[in-house]
Amino acid sequence: MRPTLLRLANASGPLPLSVSQASVQLIPPIPLYRRLLRAHRLLPVDMRYMGDSYVKSEFRLTRTTDNPLHIIGFLSQWKMYLDEIESSLIRPDGRKQGQAVEWRGKKLDTGAFEKLSTEQVGQLYELMHATKDVWKSPEQIEREANSAGVSPVNPNDPTTAGNS
C-alpha cells in the first residue's frame, strides 16, 4: 500500500453535522450490548427478560462472524433499535420515564414486509399469534377462558398443573 493511501485510511472522518447523523454512527459491540441491556431496564419486567435473552443470544451467535458487511449490518440494526427504545422511554429533558410508559414498538413498514421471504413471513405470523395475549391483563385472559368454558391453568401453580 502506498503511503498516501495509508494516511488516508488512518484519517478520521468528518464530524457529523447534525444529531441524526451522529446517531447513525456505529457503536462498538460491547458498549452497544451494555447500552441495550441498560435500556431494557426501563421496559416492563416481562418485556425486559424477553429482550435481554434475545439480545444475549443474538450477540452470542454473531460473536464469531468475520464478514465485515454482516458485522456492520448487525451493529447498525441494533443501534437503530437502541435509538428507538431510548427515544420512546426517555424524555427530551433526559429524565427516564420508567415503568409508567409501556413501549409497544412500531408498525412494520410495508417496504420491509415486501422484502421478507416466505419463511420469514411464516415466522412473523407465528410470532403474531404467540404474542397476541401479551398486552392482556390476567383478568382479561381469565374472563376469556371462562367465557369459552375452559379453566385457565397456570403451569407454575402446583395446585392446577395436573388438572388440565
UniProtKB/Swiss-Prot annotation:
Chain intervals with Polar residues compositional bias: 153-164
Highest taxon listed in the record's lineage: Eukaryota
Localization per record: Mitochondrion matrix
Residue ranges, compositional bias (Basic and acidic residues): 136-145
Keyword terms: Chaperone, Gluconeogenesis, Mitochondrion, Transit peptide
One GO location term (cellular component): mitochondrial intermembrane space
InterPro entries membership: SDHAF3/Sdh7
Spans annotated as Disordered: 136-164
Cystine crosslinks: none
Pfam families per the UniProt record, alphabetical: Complex1_LYR_2
Any GO BP annotation: regulation of gluconeogenesis
Residue range of the transit peptide in the UniProt record, numbered on this chain: 1-51
Family note: Belongs to the complex I LYR family. SDHAF3 subfamily.
Function: Plays an essential role in the assembly of succinate dehydrogenase (SDH), an enzyme complex (also referred to as respiratory complex II) that is a component of both the tricarboxylic acid (TCA) cycle and the mitochondrial electron transport chain, and which couples the oxidation of succinate to fumarate with the reduction of ubiquinone (coenzyme Q) to ubiquinol. Promotes maturation of the iron-sulfur protein subunit of the SDH catalytic dimer, protecting it from the deleterious effects of oxidants. May act together with SDHAF1.
Complexes and interactors: Interacts with the iron-sulfur protein subunit within the SDH catalytic dimer.
UniProt-recorded name of the protein: Succinate dehydrogenase assembly factor 3, mitochondrial
Native source species: Cryptococcus neoformans var. neoformans serotype D (strain JEC21 / ATCC MYA-565)
Taxon lineage: Eukaryota, Fungi, Dikarya, Basidiomycota, Agaricomycotina
